[in-house]
Amino acid sequence: MTDAPLSEAMKPIIFSASEGPLSRAQAEEAFNLMFEGLASPAQMGGLIMAIRARGESVAEYAAAAQVMRDRCVKVSAPDGAMDIVGTGGDGMGTLNISTATAFVVAGAGVPVAKHGNRNLSSKSGAADVLTQMGINVMVGAAVVEQSLKEAGIGFMMAPMHHPAVKHVMPIRQELGCKTIFNILGPLTNPAGAKRQLTGAFAIDLIYPMAETLKELGSEAAWLVHGSDGTDEISISGKTDVVELKDGALRSRVVHPEDAGLPVHPFRDILGGTPDENAQAFRDLLDGAQGAYRDAVLLNAAAALIVAGRVTELRDGVEIARESIDSGAAKRAVEAVARVTSTSTA
């Protein structure tokens, strides 16, 4: 077979991975082979599990993310575009907080290039609820770009933009455990967004993910993990944050009261089916009060800090509140639905 010599190239890399962290160059070579379909299933599984067993390094995260970025179907986004996304996988089953936050932030005038997928840890992922909202998520780069232009926000469905991952998907499904691929979504925005509000399913991921985004050229980011276990800023308690700003990382803790918001019981943000979550989203856009609104206001305030619009959470909450109450966030949803409804690709 013509790919046998290239598969041979994986053997020393797998051995190195079992002994210690790979160099960035080694990891990039390995992930290129995997995404080209030139490594055998056993080799791909062996490498993934060797890395997982000892813990992934920042160089390995950065290498995998860079290879995915290089191979993705790219989207041209406005300057200052940001992504608001979580890793998923927290298993908490909440309402769609980051999705609603993205539209509130877009309604406030910050371009949002949102990268997402279907459900991972809940009954309703971003793509599931957006579909229920009348948005066609299975669109190509040109439609996403038009959506960004007309609505100030575009949704990039991960499988539409990362076709090379098809070679790895069967391996991931057979392994059935969390691997490096569970955190790559937020690191591989097809629009090359350089500002991120990113949630992680585990607290020990937020610092290395922040380091990775710095390595990949991000300008500003908040990496967050809520004390309630969510991959978002918690409305029910404190949230650990690693902030990337001016090329430096610093850790901080935020609390709803820092933003002038009340603490709500975690049960009040639990979600349901895509249809139920979409209805909660519609109600929020129409002015419904309560835990969901406050969670979105809090996350939007943080996103506005990352975007450089404000420096304090309380100021961000006021801008986010105006985005909802003025109807701007709702108009952003309607505009994306309009743009995407005329396309099937």
Swiss-Prot record:
Cofactor(s) needed, names only, are:
Mg(2+)
Entry keyword set: Amino-acid biosynthesis, Aromatic amino acid biosynthesis, Glycosyltransferase, Magnesium, Metal-binding, Transferase, Tryptophan biosynthesis
How is the co-factor bound, per the entry?
Binds 2 magnesium ions per monomer.
Q: In which pathway does it act?
A: Amino-acid biosynthesis; L-tryptophan biosynthesis; L-tryptophan from chorismate: step 2/5
Question: What Gene Ontology molecular function terms does this protein carry?
Answer: anthranilate phosphoribosyltransferase activity; magnesium ion binding
Q: Which GO terms describe its biological process?
A: L-tryptophan biosynthetic process
Q: What start and end residues bound the annotated signal peptide?
A: none
List, alphabetically, the InterPro entries matched.
Answer: Anthranilate_Pribosyl_Tfrase (IPR005940), Glycosyl_Trfase_fam3 (IPR000312), Glycosyl_Trfase_fam3_N_dom (IPR017459), Glycosyl_Trfase_fam3_N_dom_sf (IPR036320), Nuc_phospho_transferase (IPR035902)
Q: Which residues bind anthranilate 1?
A: G86, N117
According to its UniProt record, what is one Pfam family this protein matches? Answer: Glycos_transf_3
Give me the residues that bind anthranilate 2, please: R172
Positions bound to Mg(2+) 1? S98, E232
EC number(s) from the headed UniProt entry? 2.4.2.18
> Subunit details for this protein?
Homodimer.
What PANTHER family would the database entry show? ANTHRANILATE PHOSPHORIBOSYLTRANSFERASE (PTHR43285:SF2)
User: Cross-referenced NCBIfam families, in alphabetical order?
Assistant: trpD
Please give the family membership noted in the entry.
Belongs to the anthranilate phosphoribosyltransferase family.
What the protein does comes down to: Catalyzes the transfer of the phosphoribosyl group of 5-phosphorylribose-1-pyrophosphate (PRPP) to anthranilate to yield N-(5'-phosphoribosyl)-anthranilate (PRA).
Q: What is the protein name for this chain?
A: Anthranilate phosphoribosyltransferase
